[in-house]
Each structure stands twice: as structure tokens, then as C-alpha cells.
């Protein structure tokens, strides 16, 4: 077993001893918030972990990588990668009783960059994540009408036909790309601000501010709704979905295993990435949430419970989504068949009702035998239920195009639309609680505003600042900017941060010290499983996933999909290359948080090297005194 521990002088002076923890907890009662009860804490963590990615990415990956076969690598990596890191974040936050910045600064001053990296990543992800919530609110507002505005194409200016762009695509495509985003044909074509999206963005940030205005004191109340309502809606959708024609086609298609996919490296790497991102690890929010717990809270049990529910939710959502996708595919299959039947009836003047799906092939053969020349003139569509089911869509396309199209074909479609977007709103909002916590608490530790200022002011300034920056997402090119940030802000930086977190706890803080801390908090030491995963397995898996992502991103040209009515294959999306200046944006978005970790460590090393010996001795004495008094500023 690896027992390497790097030199870390002054650690005992920077962190409270185990004997002091209970006293510190009592002293914090009046100055630091605590959870009202265990349910608040668990619901908040679940809300942060279970987000929009569970709805629109996991089902896509399941379907793309062998259906039920994908569950095998997903569950294996859930156990070997997700749960150990979640347990580590819960335990270190509960032990050191600080936010992410304070935790890593306490472990070693040079690790302050790790907390800064988490804060920057939380900020950038929250920047675009709340824009998605604003889109959800726009669809929710438009759901309170009959018929739904994306049910039919609008008429053109002359009232003589449908708008050409809609007629060439579909009503759901047109409502999403034109009436919602009013999208341009390039990220370079910024266009103007769409006022309706700006108003929705303002509403989204206002709601978030009201829910996070006093930290866990307000979010702890909100999660009773935001973290439980999605499960109620999902269950309602499952019951409704299973009663729809063709729902079982989707579920069978989803879980039909293709075991050959298990031999593909991409399957395992995508499973590892999905486990990692679905837990919202490395944002700093989970560390902050756990720091408000009692010293003797059983963080091991919490991590296992949250992990099991998170994994169960991913599978549960996939079943719900593909029951609806199965219904949609069956509807499209029936429409396709109806078109072919009509073609045959009109071509041979057959009586209506004489041709059905069951006898269609037989009627084709009869017509072909009776008049081969006339039959050869007919053009039939290819109707394949598996082809319709295979049209895998992830991300916003699943929520705002595929699901909305399926909803329009349901009876009482406005009701189902309202329920669906309320569910998405709750999932997105509860995830944003963790992102805000990952920004607010580190900024408090940095003392960017005077300590006497109330938390409401800091939270308000953050919401206002991010709202103003978010104007870029309300431009005609806003969706392209959001996709860019989604691809790079919440991927490579999080992998680097998570790897550094585990390395720092195991080899800088010391895994033996960590084991003793946990034994003090929960009554027993972590077993051999946790030892092996923390020391070797989990860091190795994260390193492999990071290297894979890095190699793929560096070796491939950066491209993105655009919506261009002038494209010859419209309504298919067109893939084009990013302009060169986007590479600078990618470096800023992915590189700055990642480089903050070694950058601050180098800065600290140079500063300590240049410091006079007498000053260094005085600094250590000051730090020790401040730590004992609880006044240490990070």
C-alpha cells in the first residue's frame, strides 16, 4: 500500500485538532449557519448532483453505447470513481469546517489555487447554466396556451401559406431556433439582444437570488420543493408514458444490450466522464454544504446514499425519456406509413380503408403485378421504427425539440408541457444552488467585500454581475456561446481539480491523518475499499479520462453546429469550423481555472523564497496564532 506523504510543515497549526472540533462547533452556533435537519442537507446535495445532465445526457449515452450494456461500465465506474471522490469531499469539508478555498488553504497555503480554480469553474458554469433555466422559463410561460405555439407553423406575411423556414423544417424546430433563439448562422454574427430572452434571464437570476439570498438558510427551505418535485413529475410522466402507443418500443430499444460495445474504449471513457460530471464534483459546493454538518455526522453513509439515488435517478430518467421517445418514434412511423398508403391509394385509385399497415406489402405486390409501369412511378418513403428510435439527441435538442414534439401529440398537451418544464426548472435551479455556494463562500473567505456587509449584498452583486455578463447569451449567437462554454468550462478544469483534490488529501494532508479524522467523526476507520480507491484507483481513472479528453480536443479541429436555412441539406445542422479567435476564448475558459492551481503554487514558492528568514518566522507565528483564534483569512 502506498504510504507516501509529502512534507507539509505547519499543518498542525493551520487546522484545528480533533479535540478542538466539538468546541469549535459549539462556538460556531451563533456565527456560522447550520442545517435545520438532515433532510435539508441530503435534499440540497441531491439537488446539486441530480441536474439537467441526468435528463438529457445519460439517456443519449445509454442509447449510443449498447443500451443496457452501458450500465455495466457506468455502475463499475460509479463505484470506483464517483463514490470515493464524493465521500472525500464530504469528509474533508466536515472535518475542516470551511468552504473549498478555506479547506485547501488549510491543508497547504500553496493549494489556495485549487480553491480559486473551483470558484472560477463554478462561476463560469453558473454563467451559462442559468441561461438554460431562462430558456426553460420561456417555454414554461408559453405552455399556458392551447394549442401550444410549437404545434403548428405560423402563416407567412401574405397569409397564403406557412413561413418557408418552418415548412422546410418543423414547427418545433422553428419555434426553438427562430422564435426562441432567433439564431444567427455563425458565432461571429452576434446580432442584437433578444428582449424576450433578456427578460427571462432577468427572471431566472431574480429567482435564484431570492432562493440563495441567505445561503443555506433559504436554499434549505427551497429544496423541499426543487429536489422532490422532479421525482413526482417523473413518476407521472412514466405512468403516462407507459400508456402511450409505442412506449415499450423505446424502452426495449434503450435496454437491448449490445455487448460488443463493452470492448470499445469510448464506452468506458464516456461512462467515466458521465459518472464524474453527474455528481457535480470539484465545484466546491459539496465541500461547503458538508462543512455545515455536525462534527459527528456519518458522511460515509451520506456519500453512499447520494450516490445510489443519483445512479438510480439516471436510469429512472432514461426509462421515462425513452418511453416518450418510443411514442414519438411510433407516431412518426405511423405517419410515414400513412403517407405511403396514401401514395398507393392515389396511384391506383383504391378505395379508402382498403390498404392498411398489415396488408401494405401484399397490396404493393398486387399493384406492381397489375401495372408495373404505373407502380414504378410511385415514390415511397422508408419507414423503419428502429431508424426513428436511433435518432439519438442529447442536450438542449432533447428537451426543446424531441420532447416538445412528443408532447404536442399527447392529449392535454399544455398540461404535460407545463409539468415537463416545471420539472426541468426545479432540476436546474437546485443545481444552481450548489454553483452559487461554490462562488459565494470562497469570495467571503477572500474578503472581497468588507466583513460587515451582509451576505445578501455579496449574493446580490454576484447575481447582478453574472446577469450582465450573461447578456452575451441573449444575442443571436448566444446559443453558440453557450455550447462553447458547456464544452470547455465544465470538462477539463473539473477533471484537473478533482485529481488535485484527491492527491492533496491523500499525499499532502496525509491519508493516515485523514483516516483518523474520519474515525473520530463517524466512529470507525474507512475500510480497505476506500483506501485502495483513494490512493490508486480513482486518481488513475481520472488521469486516464483527462488524458483522453485532452488528446481528443487537441488533435481535432474545433467545430460547431449551426442552423442555416440556406444550407443545401437543411433542416440538418451544418458543421463548420470555429474562427481562430475562439481558440483564445477556449484557453481562457478551460486554461485559466486549470492553470490557477500551479500558478498560485509557483507564486507562493517564489514569495516564500524571497522572504527574509526573520519575516518567515514571524509569519509562521502569526499564522499559528490566527489559526488558534479562528481569525485566519484565506
From Swiss-Prot:
Glycans are attached at residues 158, 182, 258, 354, 368. Robust expression in kidney and small intestine, with minimal expression in pancreas. Also expressed in stomach, liver, duodenum, ileocecum, colon and prostate. Not detected in testis, whole brain, cerebellum, fetal liver, spleen, skeletal muscle, uterus, heart or lung. GO terms for cellular component: apical plasma membrane; brush border membrane; extracellular exosome; plasma membrane. Its main location: membrane. The chain crosses the membrane at residues 42-62, 68-88, 121-141, 193-213, 222-242, 269-289, 305-325, 414-434, 457-477, 491-511, 532-552, 582-602. GO terms for biological process: amino acid transport; neutral amino acid transport; response to nutrient; sodium ion transmembrane transport; viral life cycle. Keywords: Amino-acid transport, Cell membrane, Disease variant, Glycoprotein, Membrane, Phosphoprotein, Symport, Transmembrane, Transmembrane helix, Transport. Changing residue 265 to L: In HND; does not affect interaction with ACE2; coexpression with ACE2 increased the transport rate whereas coexpression with CLTRN has the opposite effect. Transporter that mediates resorption of neutral amino acids across the apical membrane of renal and intestinal epithelial cells. This uptake is sodium-dependent and chloride-independent. Requires CLTRN in kidney or ACE2 in intestine for cell surface expression and amino acid transporter activity. Interacts in a tissue-specific manner with ACE2 in small intestine and with CLTRN in the kidney. Interacts with CLTRN; this interaction is required for trafficking of SLC6A19 to the plasma membrane and for its catalytic activation in kidneys. Interacts with ACE2; this interaction is required for trafficking of SLC6A19 to the plasma membrane and for its catalytic activation in intestine. Interacts with ANPEP; the interaction positively regulates its amino acid transporter activity. Belongs to the sodium:neurotransmitter symporter (SNF) (TC 2.A.22) family. SLC6A19 subfamily. This is Sodium-dependent neutral amino acid transporter B(0)AT1. It comes from Homo sapiens.
Amino acid at each position: 500500500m502506498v504510504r507516501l506523504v509529502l512534507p507539509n510543515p505547519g499543518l498542525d497549526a493551520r487546522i484545528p485538532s480533533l479535540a478542538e472540533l466539538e468546541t469549535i462547533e459549539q462556538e460556531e452556533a451563533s456565527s456560522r449557519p447550520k442545517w435545520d435537519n438532515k433532510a435539508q442537507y441530503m435534499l440540497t446535495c441531491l439537488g446539486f448532483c441530480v441536474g439537467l445532465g441526468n435528463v438529457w445526457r445519460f439517456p443519449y449515452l445509454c442509447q449510443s453505447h449498447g443500451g443496457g450494456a452501458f450500465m455495466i461500465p457506468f455502475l463499475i465506474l460509479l463505484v470506483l470513481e464517483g463514490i470515493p471522490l464524493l465521500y472525500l469531499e464530504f469528509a474533508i469539508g466536515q472535518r475542516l469546517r470551511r468552504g473549498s478555498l478555506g479547506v485547501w488553504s488549510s491543508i497547504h497555503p500553496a493549494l489556495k489555487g485549487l480553491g480559486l480554480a473551483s470558484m472560477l469553474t463554478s462561476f463560469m458554469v453558473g454563467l451559462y447554466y442559468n441561461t438554460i433555466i431562462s430558456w426553460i422559463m420561456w417555454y414554461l410561460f408559453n405552455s399556458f396556451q392551447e394549442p401550444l405555439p410549437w404545434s403548428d407553423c405560423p402563416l407567412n406575411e401574405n397569409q397564403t401559406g406557412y413561413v418557408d423556414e418552418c415548412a422546410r423544417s418543423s414547427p418545433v424546430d422553428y419555434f426553438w431556433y427562430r422564435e426562441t433563439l432567433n439564431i444567427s448562422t455563425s458565432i461571429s454574427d452576434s446580432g442584437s439582444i433578444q428582449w424576450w430572452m433578456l427578460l427571462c434571464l432577468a427572471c431566472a437570476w431574480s429567482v435564484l437570488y431570492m432562493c440563495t439570498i441567505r445561503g443555506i438558510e433559504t436554499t434549505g427551505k427551497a429544496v423541499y420543493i426543487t429536489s422532490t418535485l422532479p421525482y413526482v413529475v417523473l413518476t407521472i410522466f412514466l405512468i403516462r408514458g407507459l400508456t402511450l402507443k409505442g412506449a415499450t418500443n423505446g424502452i426495449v430499444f434503450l435496454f437491448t444490450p449490445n455487448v460488443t460495445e463493452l470492448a470499445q474504449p469510448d464506452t468506458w471513457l464516456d461512462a467515466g466522464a458521465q459518472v464524474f460530471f453527474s455528481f457535480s464534483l470539484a465545484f466546491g459546493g459539496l465541500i461547503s454544504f458538508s462543512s455545515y454538518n455536525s462534527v459527528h455526522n456519518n458522511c460515509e453513509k451520506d456519500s453512499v446514499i447520494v450516490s445510489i439515488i443519483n445512479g438510480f435517478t439516471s436510469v429512472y430518467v432514461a426509462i421515462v425519456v425513452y418511453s416518450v421517445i418510443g411514442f414519438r418514434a411510433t407516431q412518426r412511423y405511423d405517419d410515414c406509413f400513412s403517407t405511403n398508403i396514401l401514395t398507393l391509394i392515389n396511384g391506383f385509385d383504391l378505395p379508402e380503408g382498403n390498404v392498411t399497415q398489415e396488408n401494405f406489402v401484399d397490396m404493393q405486390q398486387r399493384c406492381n403485378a397489375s401495372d408495373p409501369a404505373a407502380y414504378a412511378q410511385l415514390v415511397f418513403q422508408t419507414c423503419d421504427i428502429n431508424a426513428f428510435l436511433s435518432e439519438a439527441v442529447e442536450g438542449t435538442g432533447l428537451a426543446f425539440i424531441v420532447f416538445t414534439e412528443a408532447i404536442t401529440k399527447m392529449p392535454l398537451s399544455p398540461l404535460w408541457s407545463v409539468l415537463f418544464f416545471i420539472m426541468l426548472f426545479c432540476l436546474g435551479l437546485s443545481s444552481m444552488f450548489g454553483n452559487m455556494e461554490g462562488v459565494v463562500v470562497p469570495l467571503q473567505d477572500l474578503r472581497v467585500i468588507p466583513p460587515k456587509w451582509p451576505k445578501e449584498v455579496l449574493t446580490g452583486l454576484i447575481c447582478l454581475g453574472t446577469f450582465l455578463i450573461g447578456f452575451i447569451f441573449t444575442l443571436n449567437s448566444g446559443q453558440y456561446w453557450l455550447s462553447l462554454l458547456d464544452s470547455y468550462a465544465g470538462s477539463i478544469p473539473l477533471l484537473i481539480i478533482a485529481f488535485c483534490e484527491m492527491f492533496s488529501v491523500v499525499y499532502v494532508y496525509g491519508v493516515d491523518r485523514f483516516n483518523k479524522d474520519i474515525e473520530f467523526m463517524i466512529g470507525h476507520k474507512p475500510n480497505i475499499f476506500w483506501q485502495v480507491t483513494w490512493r490508486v484507483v480513482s486518481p488513475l481513472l481520472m488521469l486516464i479520462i483527462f488524458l483522453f479528453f485532452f488528446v481528443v480536443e487537441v488533435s481535432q479541429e474545433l467545430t460547431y453546429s449551426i442552423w442555416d436555412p440556406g444550407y443545401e441539406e437543411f433542416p440538418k445542422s451544418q458543421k463548420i469550423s470555429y474562427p481562430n479567435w475562439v481558440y483564445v476564448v477556449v484557453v481562457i475558459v478551460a486554461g485559466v481555472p486549470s492553470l490557477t492551481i500551479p500558478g498560485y503554487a509557483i507564486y507562493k514558492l517564489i514569495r516564500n523564497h524571497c522572504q527574509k528568514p526573520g519575516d518567515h518566522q514571524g509569519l509562521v507565528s502569526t499564522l499559528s496564532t490566527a489559526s488558534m483564534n479562528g481569525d485566519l483569512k484565506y
